[in-house]
């Protein structure tokens, strides 16, 4: 395992040597007033950042084509393919995965897509089941153990659209999915990158509960809205009781598990999508995990406890919050260049 930990291991990069300088987590150094982890986390998905990214959003979405993918088992997922126009042949195709209750239109995904397109990569932004405006596509609810359909989506993207190597990159829960896709289907991807991935879901749930009130309020508000949308589309299904919907994050998650997943307990479900400890030790493809020591949602100890193969780079910044990494007051994210450089290295090293 290659590890870089800014501020915790003297800021010295111990990742494998590169042919040319490449960004490390240690290079992320926000202004003092921007270093607060909660500010970093909130700004990343803020309305202000969406406003500042409006030109990039227009450019990405103007050239995007919607596709409904057959992911096997009668599951359909929506995604948006955007072709690059800066080189004759694309340097690769990158599948981008959003976080829980995000979407293919989330600011961090659109900003990353714009950066990759500018470097000559095609981009496919996938919506998970029941994310974005896709609740009508499948009758059953989304849950985080639905890895088979995401693997199916990536395989479909590779088969139908890719004329160059394929990589997958994800944020938060999307990072967890990205690493599980690479673990399950190494033939599908040449590289995987995860930003602040959920490692131990039980610890992540506890972190949301014990953190500042606005994190849990934010996710509960979005999740309840998603469940109401599902109920409107499929009124014949007994989705949740009023008591379930008024519960906190743990209570509503437990109700989801017992009513709609087939798992016997909340604990069994959370363990079902854990990638903690030794679970990534058999990962065959090169991968990078970028996180921040001050992430208020995902405990940094989860990353220290990982057992990873040599081709997996673990890069821990001192600051960055949860999927923040906001560099300056223009709200530019460090992750754009960071991801683009690694895609260049792993998908098109000779370009």
For every predicted segment, state its role.
Residues 283, 289-291, 295:
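Short beta-strand/loop motif that positions the catalytic acidic residue
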Residues 255-279:
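Active-site nucleophile elbow and catalytic-triad environment of alpha/beta-hydrolase enzymes
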Residues 45-86, 326-327:
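N-terminal cap/lid segment of alpha/beta-hydrolase-fold proteins
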């Amino acid at each position: 395992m290659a590890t870089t930990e800014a501020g915790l291991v003297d800021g010295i990069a111990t990742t494998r040597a590169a042919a040319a300088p490449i960004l490390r987590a240690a290079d992320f150094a926000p202004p003092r007033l921007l270093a607060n982890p909660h500010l970093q986390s909130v700004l990343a998905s803020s309305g202000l950042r969406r406003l500042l990214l409006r030109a990039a959003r227009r450019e990405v979405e103007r050239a995007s084509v919607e596709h409904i993918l057959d992911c096997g088992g009668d599951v359909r997922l929506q995604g948006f393919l955007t072709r690059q126009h800066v080189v004759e042949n694309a340097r690769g195709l990158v599948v981008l995965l959003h976080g829980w209750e995000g979407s293919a239109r989330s600011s961090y995904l659109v900003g990353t897509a714009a950066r990759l397109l500018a470097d000559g990569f095609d981009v496919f932004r996938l919506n998970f089941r029941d994310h974005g405006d896709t609740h009508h596509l499948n009758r059953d609810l989304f849950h985080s153990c639905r890895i088979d359909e995401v693997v199916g989506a990536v395989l479909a993207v590779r088969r139908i659209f890719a004329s160059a190597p394929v990589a997958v990159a994800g944020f938060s829960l999307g990072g967890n999915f990205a690493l599980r896709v690479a673990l399950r289907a190494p033939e599908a991807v040449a590289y995987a990158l995860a930003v602040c991935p959920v490692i131990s879901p039980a610890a992540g749930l506890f972190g949301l509960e014990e953190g500042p009130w606005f994190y849990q309020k934010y996710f509960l508000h979005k999740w309840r809205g998603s469940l109401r949308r599902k109920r409107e589309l499929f009124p014949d299904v007994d989705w949740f009781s009023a008591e379930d919907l008024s519960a906190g994050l743990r209570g509503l998650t437990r109700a989801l598990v017992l009513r709609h997943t087939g798992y016997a307990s909340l604990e069994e479900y959370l363990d079902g999508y854990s990638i903690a400890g030794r679970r990534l030790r058999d990962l065959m493809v090169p991968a990078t995990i970028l996180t921040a020591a001050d992430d208020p949602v995902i405990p940094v100890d989860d990353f220290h406890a990982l057992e990873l193969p040599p081709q997996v780079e673990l890069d821990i910044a001192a600051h960055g919050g949860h999927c923040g990494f906001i560099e300056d007051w223009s709200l530019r994210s460090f992750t754009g260049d960071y991801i683009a450089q690694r895609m260049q290295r792993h998908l098109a090293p000779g370009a």
